[in-house]
């Protein structure tokens, strides 16, 4: 799966429009960087298994109140779980 595929899935789940695609893709890249630095393998990041956490992250950032931006605990917990799973081929 490519970043464009992931972006399209996140946009669909959140009910956003194509107009916001570039912004959403920037948020997704930020989430991917976070996941990668947390030890999640690229094979998991670029799979269906990361769509849920990516949706959570984009939703957190999309709906922030100025000065109170936080990523959700659920996103953080899911990233931790995925980091322990190793490559898709090993699961």
Spell out what each predicted region is.
Residues 1-91:
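Divalent metal-cofactor coordination and adjacent catalytic microenvironments
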């Amino acid at each position: 799966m490519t970043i464009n595929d992931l972006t399209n899935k996140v946009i669909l789940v959140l009910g956003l429009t194509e107009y916001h695609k570039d912004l959403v893709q920037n948020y997704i890249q930020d989430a991917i960087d976070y996941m990668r630095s947390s030890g999640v393998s690229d094979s998991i990041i670029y799979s269906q298994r990361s769509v849920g956490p990516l949706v959570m992250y984009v939703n957190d950032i999309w709906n922030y109140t100025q000065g109170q931006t936080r990523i959700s605990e659920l996103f953080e917990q899911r990233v931790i779980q995925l980091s322990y799973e190793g490559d898709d081929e090993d699961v």
